[in-house]
């Protein structure tokens, strides 16, 4: 699908111009092994990754900085009834995919086709807007282009085959003022929830945002940047690059994913707080000012909403945004334990495939839609708690509580916790040259797999030696 400059007014009106500019330049490849290892640490009950670093997660701040999508706006919560979708699609874009074929034998059922179209069908019919197209035709092609992009990126379902009808329906009116940023994060949270609770592979959601979030903060599976390709903003601030431009052209990994997955698992098990880039977007006056390029203003337009504790809504999916659990990522005081907020198992159970009878999600989730609107209203009215700056001692106390309260390792430990030294003062250790290099690098070797290997090897050899002693042998005879 090629972009046509005639689409720009409609993409701008829909609030998607910064994001479309990002993805049409081509997006960096996902490191599937690193993402899988990271998702192993996801906990649906807190919407955070549980690591030795404490809790970490993708927040509204990250979505805004990486994608340039608006946070302020309306939750995307509508009627997803697909009854008569073919007639509606025909009216909206002028054509529909062919009907499924009739079965050749009477005893076979008719092929079931999801409401929507395959990406192949869309590409074959809407790849290029005709040069002599009138305004209505250009508008149609722009609508289909946006449908194609959001279905493949923001709302990817893990199959890479179909663009659901509901996302095209959401683009019926361009100026709907959707809160695309909160919608994208809600969908990503739900995909992470589902992926962490099932035994089969596959995950959807905006993996572009998740990947760049990980690369910015964690030195595990981080690629090396090669260069920046020229970015023509056409003197339009909304066409300036987002923070994702820092990862414009990368060196791709060609290693065996199964081997790298084991390595990444070990590294994530061993990563420590001082090896994390906690505030990658800068601090104070330098916040949001990358040295290499000018940042798109949409990245920071809604920064006053980043700390909202609110429901994030994407049709059937309602997921809570809990930034107070990861205040260290904002350079703020981390209390312990963080105030508990129930993420509600009943909400997690809501699924458009399992609850087919529920169609009008705007009515079903009205309470949460109102909560989101009130959260925005309270922030804009200046009604929010005063937040304190990061305190190293408080964060150390939080870590002591956190590590005693949850599981942070995926791999079976090779040692008993009681043999470890007392916790160090993390902010002091962070100044050590090794940890500074790790934060900026792309691996925590040798402290992760190597340390685990050495300890396990020593334990195995010690066990072998002890078995040769009189006390260790069953017959009472030993070599010593």
Task: Annotate each predicted stretch with a short phrase.
Residues 1-480:
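Structural stabilizers in ordered domains
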């Amino acid at each position: 699908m090629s972009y046509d400059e005639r689409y720009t007014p409609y993409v701008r009106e829909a609030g998607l111009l910064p994001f479309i500019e990002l993805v049409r330049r081509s997006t960096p490849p996902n490191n599937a092994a690193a993402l899988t290892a990271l998702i192993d640490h996801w906990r649906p009950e807190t919407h955070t990754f549980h690591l030795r670093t404490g809790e970490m997660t993708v927040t509204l701040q990250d979505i805004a900085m990486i994608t340039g999508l608006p946070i302020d706006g309306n939750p995307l919560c509508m009627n997803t009834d697909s009854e008569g979708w073919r007639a509606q699609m025909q009216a909206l874009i002028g054509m529909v995919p062919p009907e499924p074929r009739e079965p050749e034998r009477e005893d076979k059922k008719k092929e079931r086709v999801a409401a929507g179209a395959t990406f192949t069908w869309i590409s074959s019919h809407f790849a290029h807007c005709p040069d002599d197209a009138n305004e209505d035709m250009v508008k149609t092609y722009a609508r289909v282009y946006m449908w194609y992009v959001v279905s493949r990126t923001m709302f990817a379902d893990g199959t890479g085959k179909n663009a659901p009808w509901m996302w095209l329906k959401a683009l019926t009116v361009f100026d709907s003022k959707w809160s695309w940023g909160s919608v994208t994060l809600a969908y990503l949270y739900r995909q992470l929830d589902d992926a962490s609770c099932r035994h089969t592979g596959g995950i959807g959601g905006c993996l572009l945002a998740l990947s760049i979030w990980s690369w910015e903060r964690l030195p595990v599976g981080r690629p090396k940047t090669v260069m920046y390709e020229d970015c023509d903003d056409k003197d339009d601030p909304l066409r300036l690059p987002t923070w994702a431009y820092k990862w414009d052209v990368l060196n791709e990994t060609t290693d065996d994913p199964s081997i790298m997955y084991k390595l990444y698992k070990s590294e994530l098990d061993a990563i420590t707080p001082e090896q994390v880039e906690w505030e990658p977007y800068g601090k104070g006056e330098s916040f949001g000012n990358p040295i290499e390029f000018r940042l798109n203003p949409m990245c920071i337009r809604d920064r006053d909403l980043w700390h909202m504790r609110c429901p994030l809504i994407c049709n059937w999916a309602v997921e809570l945004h809990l930034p107070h659990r990861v205040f260290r990522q904002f350079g703020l005081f981390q209390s312990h334990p963080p105030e508990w907020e129930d993420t509600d198992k009943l909400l997690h159970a809501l699924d458009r495939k399992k609850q087919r009878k529920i169609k009008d999600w705007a009515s079903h989730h009205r309470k949460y839609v109102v909560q989101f609107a009130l959260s925005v209203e309270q922030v804009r009215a200046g009604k929010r708690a005063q937040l304190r700056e990061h305190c190293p001692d408080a964060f150390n106390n939080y870590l002591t509580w956190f590590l005693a309260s949850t599981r942070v390792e995926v791999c079976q430990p090779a040692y008993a916790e009681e043999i470890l030294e007392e916790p160090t003062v993390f902010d002091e250790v962070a100044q050590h040259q090794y940890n500074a290099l790790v934060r900026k690098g792309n691996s925590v070797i040798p402290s992760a797999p190597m340390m685990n290997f050495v300890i396990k090897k020593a334990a195995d050899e010690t066990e072998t030696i002890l078995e040769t002693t009189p006390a260790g042998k069953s017959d009472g005879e030993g070599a010593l």
